[in-house]
Amino acid sequence: MRILPQEPVIREEQNWLTILKNAISDPKLLLKALNLPEDDFEQSIAARKLFSLRVPQPFIDKIEKGNPQDPLFLQVMCSDLEFVQAEGFSTDPLEEKNANAVPNILHKYRNRLLFMAKGGCAVNCRYCFRRHFPYDENPGNKKSWQLALDYIAAHSEIEEVIFSGGDPLMAKDHELAWLIKHLENIPHLQRLRIHTRLPVVIPQRITDEFCTLLAETRLQTVMVTHINHPNEIDQIFAHAMQKLNAVNVTLLNQSVLLKGVNDDAQILKILSDKLFQTGILPYYLHLLDKVQGASHFLISDIEAMQIYKTLQSLTSGYLVPKLAREIAGEPNKTLYAE
């Protein structure tokens, strides 16, 4: 049964930039909003100096009040465990500095590359593998974008541009229109892929102007949402996805397997069901990238495979995402089938 988007009733008409501006950045305010005692999080609050906190109201609305183990809360609340210096964890686990060919470009793969349109995000996820990335060396402005466009134009093997970040939808619609127009003028480009978490934390970001932009481009357009738990999907998000479906955007999702958040086959099965009900196909289930500050989210490979095999037994094959790990320097992601 499909999730039939209802007429949104909460903040749907509110400008997404206003919601973004009002995002909570003080852990104490987040705890207060969720009816959680500040005294229980004294050490965790200190971890904000390692990686700032940022959570917009639409995402906070999905978190269960009074529950310190809520899976959405655990993804965004700073933790004293981030101070742990775990073996094998680093500030650049994918060695992306080696692929930073020119500002705003990560050229890891043969026929596609990542275009770092914007460095900021609407929400700071504590497991983010780019939490230490040098965004100041990759400014999201037209001057640096032009250097990136020149690089793409000079590499005829590039068929697909992947908007990444940060979050590329932090760019305003007129900025995205400028970028897409210039990409369309590069004849060897066929596809535009947009990786984003913004629609699930601020669904209002999917504006009519943005949808029109994607409807009119000659490039085949794919959006990959970043959703880890079924509780992140609500009717307002479903409405936003309906707008994208209406303009023939291919919708996929990737998740990260996170201890305490979604390390359960039944939860992943429900996630796949809800994604499909909103017109999104499960794409990747990533093993954690070993970024410094996120070791408390790590699940062993053995446990991950057990969860994955159980998931395969619970649902249809097309609803099972590919279990994958990105290994620095490899020409593609490494898949784990059995």
From Swiss-Prot:
Summarize where [4Fe-4S] cluster binds, as residue positions: 121, 125, 128
Q: How is the cofactor bound?
A: Binds 1 [4Fe-4S] cluster. The cluster is coordinated with 3 cysteines and an exchangeable S-adenosyl-L-methionine.
The Radical SAM core domain extends over 107-330
Q: Could you give a GO molecular-function term held by this entry?
A: 4 iron, 4 sulfur cluster binding
> Which terms are listed as keywords in the entry?
4Fe-4S, Iron, Iron-sulfur, Isomerase, Metal-binding, Pyridoxal phosphate, S-adenosyl-L-methionine
Query: EC annotation?
Result: 5.4.3.-
Taxonomic superkingdom: Bacteria
Instruction: Name any cofactors this protein relies on.
Output: [4Fe-4S] cluster; pyridoxal 5'-phosphate
TM region(s), chain numbering = none
Catalytically driven reaction(s): L-lysine = D-beta-lysine
Q: Which residues carry this modification: N6-(pyridoxal phosphate)lysine?
A: 333
Q: Which PANTHER family match?
A: L-LYSINE 2,3-AMINOMUTASE, LYSINE 2,3-AMINOMUTASE-RELATED
Its family remark reads:
Belongs to the radical SAM superfamily. KamA family.
- Name the job this protein performs: With EpmA is involved in the beta-lysylation step of the post-translational modification of translation elongation factor P (EF-P) on 'Lys-34'. EpmB appears to act before EpmA. Displays lysine 2,3-aminomutase activity, producing (R)-beta-lysine from (S)-alpha-lysine (L-lysine).
What is the name attached to this protein's record?
A: L-lysine 2,3-aminomutase
